[in-house]
Amino acid sequence: MTKKHIDFFEFNNSIFSMIREISHKIDLLLQETANELDITPLQLKMIITLYANREKYVSIGSLGKAIGITGGNISNICKRLEKQGFVNRVRSEEDERVVNVRLTDKGNEAACRVDDYFQKLKEDLPEGGVDVNVQTIIDELCALESLLDKYISRSGL
């Protein structure tokens, strides 16, 4: 008898393992640029996330949620990045409890350095050396997120 569906625990362990490995590999790829900028890969991920939203201020809470860091930790990291000149922090005029963050010119330059680094890596690969459609990966991850949302909804969480 053939197995129709993957076992939940096998699925769970596979996903956790892949997420950890992907995160670790991204950190490795960011490490060189982070070292050059005298920041951590996590701080560089924050800069990249802010760069994707560079037209507007982002609340510290939203930023933390986007990269999976809790409020107190994200706030401290933002303070350090501000001291180093990568971001500006501004209290919201609508709600003074909310602190918004935006990249400075130095922060934008740091994000551009990451982009340059990845473009160089891409150029160094032989033509056809990597046959990956990034949009397909993103679409499949969105489908997984949607599936998990349905499970959460059914469970009443």
What do the predicted segments below correspond to?
Residues 19-22, 26, 67, 110-126, ...:
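Alpha-helical linker/hinge and terminal dimerization helices associated
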Residues 1-37, 84:
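N-terminal leader segment of winged-helix/HTH proteins
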Residues 18, 45-49, 109:
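Pre-recognition alpha-helix immediately N-terminal to the DNA-recognition helix
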Residues 1-7, 131-157:
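C-terminal regulatory/oligomerization modules of transcriptional regulators
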Residues 79-138:
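Charged, amphipathic alpha-helical coiled-coil/dimerization segments
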